[in-house]
């Protein structure tokens, strides 16, 4: 079954025959409540953030050829694929984000991987490429289980790749950051074994008398 994205709102609550309480707004803002997104949808959003609001349509099919040899038009197959994947193409080149909001989000994503208090700092602290990222631990509401997420992009100042790692019932999102790190390393032709050794090594402190 294909999933459509759901952005939590009062209208969605009404469809579920639920009351939208003031606290729901806070829950929705941090990704809880009725929000529902697929990894591909999240990858599109992350790419848009990395590009400072520029919208890139998702393309997963290069061409489709009919049995008679004719080619299916791009508009036709894109419409079909987007419907099945629950994607919405906004038909706009850029989203109207305030510059200060984008900057705040980007700096927050930089801090996740590069600042000592970041939830993915231990994974990326010695990584040779600066990565913007966000870990996520999504409560499922079922027996205390949590889905693990990591979304990110690299390099930070000149993005080439957006990435999403999702593990159902995977626990804390920091675990998925390790998978994302290795995928990024592979994409840029880095030695993944060496990357793992460098980023997981325990830092030492030299005491000078």
Regions found by a protein language model. Give the residues of each.
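Short amphipathic alpha-helical face segments that pack within enzyme cores
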Residues: 38-44, 175-182
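Glycine-rich loops and low-complexity Gly/Arg-rich segments
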Residues: 54-55, 156, 175-178, 187-192
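Short, gly/Ser/Thr-rich active-site loops of penicillin-recognizing serine hydrolases
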Residues: 71-72, 84, 181-209
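Beta-lactam-recognizing serine transpeptidase/beta-lactamase-like catalytic domain environment
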Residues: 3-168, 205-209
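Ordered, soluble secondary-structure elements with a strong preference for glycine-centered loop motifs
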Residues: 170-174
């Amino acid at each position: 079954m294909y999933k459509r994205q759901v952005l939590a709102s009062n209208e969605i609550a009404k469809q579920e025959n639920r009351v939208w309480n003031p606290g729901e707004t806070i829950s929705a803002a941090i990704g809880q409540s009725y929000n529902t997104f697929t990894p591909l949808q999240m990858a599109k959003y992350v790419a848009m953030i990395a590009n400072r609001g520029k919208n890139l349509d998702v393309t997963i099919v290069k061409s489709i050829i009919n049995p008679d040899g004719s080619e299916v038009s791009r508009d036709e197959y894109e419409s079909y694929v987007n419907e099945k994947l629950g994607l919405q193409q906004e038909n706009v080149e850029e989203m109207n984000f305030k510059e200060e909001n984008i900057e705040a989000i980007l700096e927050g994503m930089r801090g996740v991987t590069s600042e000592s208090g970041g939830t993915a700092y231990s994974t990326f602290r010695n990584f040779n490429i600066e990565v913007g990222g966000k870990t996520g631990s999504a409560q499922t509401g079922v027996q205390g289980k949590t889905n693990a997420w990591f979304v990110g992009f690299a390099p930070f100042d000149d993005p080439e790749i957006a990435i999403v790692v999702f593990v159902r019932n995977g626990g804390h999102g920091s675990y998925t950051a390790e998978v994302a790190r290795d995928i990024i390393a592979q994409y840029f032709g880095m030695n993944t074994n060496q990357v793992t050794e460098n980023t997981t090594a325990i830092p030492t402190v030299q005491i000078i008398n």
